[in-house]
C-alpha cells in the first residue's frame, strides 16, 4: 500500500517525490495546507540527500519556498511566523488565520534548520514568544499554551504544546539530527556507490 504522500512502507522513500512532481508550479505542495506541512518537505529533502536524488532536493526546495510565502508575514518588527490556521487552506482559498497551532512552529523550525535557514527557524520559534499575528506570548512561567485564537492565546496547556515547544527549543540549541551538509551528503553517497 502507498501512503498519502506516495511512499510505500519499506520503500526507503522512493515514492516521496511523486506527489511533489505532480503538483502544479503555482501550488507545488501535494494537497491543501493542513497540519505539519513542513514535515513532508523536510522528509523529501532528507531523502534526496540520503539517496543523492537531485530532483527530490529541487522539489523540496520549491515546496519550501512556497511554504515560506504562506507561513511568514512581514510586520512592523520584521518577518513573523504566521501559520495556516486549523481550518486549512486549499488552493484558491483565503488563508485561515486562526487557530494557529504550536506543531506548526515546531515543524517549520525543524525544516528550516534542516535546510540551513537558521534565521527563519528562529523566527518560527519566536512565534511562541509573541512574534506572531497578535503579538501575544504563548509561553509563560507555567509553560506553553495550546495555540493562537482570534482572541489571544488558547489558555489550555496540553502535551502537544509542551512537546512542540521543548523539541523546537532543543533543535535550536543542539541542531537537527543528523546534521548533514547538502554538498557533502550528495558527494558522500556517490562515493559509497550511490547512483549519480
Q: Residue ranges of each PLM-predicted region?
A:
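Glycan-recognition and catalytic cores of secretory/periplasmic carbohydrate-active enzymes
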Residues: 1-196
Amino acid at each position: 500500500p502507498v501512503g498519502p504522500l506516495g511512499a510505500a512502507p519499506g520503500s526507503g522513500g522512493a515514492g516521496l517525490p511523486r506527489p511533489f512532481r505532480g503538483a502544479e508550479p503555482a501550488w507545488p505542495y501535494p494537497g491543501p495546507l493542513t497540519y505539519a506541512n513542513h514535515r513532508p518537505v523536510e522528509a523529501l529533502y532528507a531523502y534526496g540527500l540520503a539517496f543523492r536524488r537531485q530532483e527530490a532536493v529541487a522539489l523540496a526546495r520549491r515546496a519550501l519556498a512556497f511554504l515560506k510565502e504562506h507561513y511568514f508575514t512581514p510586520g512592523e518588527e520584521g518577518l513573523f511566523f504566521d501559520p495556516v490556521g486549523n481550518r486549512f487552506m486549499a488552493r484558491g482559498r483565503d488563508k485561515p488565520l486562526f487557530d494557529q497551532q504550536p506543531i506548526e512552529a515546531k515543524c517549520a523550525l525543524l525544516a528550516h534548520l534542516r535546510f540551513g535557514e537558521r534565521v527563519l527557524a528562529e523566527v518560527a520559534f519566536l512565534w511562541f514568544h509573541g512574534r506572531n499575528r497578535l503579538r501575544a506570548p504563548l509561553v509563560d512561567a507555567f509553560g506553553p499554551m495550546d495555540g493562537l485564537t482570534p482572541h489571544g492565546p488558547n489558555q489550555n496547556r496540553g502535551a502537544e504544546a509542551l512537546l512542540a515547544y521543548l523539541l523546537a527549543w532543543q533543535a535550536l540549541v543542539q541542531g537537527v539530527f543528523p546534521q548533514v551538509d547538502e554538498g557533502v551528503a550528495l558527494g558522500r553517497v556517490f562515493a559509497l556507490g550511490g547512483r549519480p
